[in-house]
């Protein structure tokens, strides 16, 4: 006797994880302004129907006024900068783990802004991935003076 299983019997998790500010004071928010040398206190809640995996925070310049399609507010932007005028644009990109088995997680990180970076418009990008590999992205425009 041989037992067979079918992949049709496996329920696949296709639901995206959620990046939310429900029940917390989220930070940063759209159009928030920071100064060089300050700390960005990152605070967001992640949830998933099955199990969270990890998250990533990326900060990069928006001197060319590009978009990621997730911004809600229209922030007042500085004039566009040509890449030849960049002296020291800031790029931050860090992965963080979420404890195994968690369906909800309050993420907290304090991110130091270097004192010598180019000022101007930046994007603060959050990516959260669940254990099935589904990913949600949220991008917020911020300004660094």
Task: Identify the function of each model-found stretch.
Residues 2-3:
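C-terminal motif of bacterial Sec signal peptides marking the signal peptidase cleavage site
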Residues 6-7:
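Short, conserved catalytic or interaction motifs in soluble domains
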Residues 14-145:
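First exposed extracellular module after export/assembly in secreted or surface-exposed proteins
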């Amino acid at each position: 006797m041989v037992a067979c299983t079918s992949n049709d019997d496996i329920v696949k998790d296709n639901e995206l994880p959620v990046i939310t500010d429900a029940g917390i004071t989220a930070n940063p928010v759209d159009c928030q302004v920071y100064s060089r040398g300050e700390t960005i206190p990152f605070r967001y809640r992640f949830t998933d129907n099955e199990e969270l995996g990890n998250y990533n925070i990326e900060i990069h310049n928006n001197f060319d006024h590009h978009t990621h399609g997730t911004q809600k507010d229209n922030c007042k932007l500085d004039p566009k900068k040509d890449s030849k005028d960049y002296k020291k644009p800031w790029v931050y990109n860090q992965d963080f783990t979420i404890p195994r088995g968690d369906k909800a997680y309050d993420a907290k990180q304090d991110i130091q802004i270097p004192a010598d970076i180019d000022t101007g418009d930046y994007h603060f990008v959050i990516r959260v991935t669940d254990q099935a590999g589904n990913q949600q992205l949220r991008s917020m425009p911020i300004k660094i003076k």
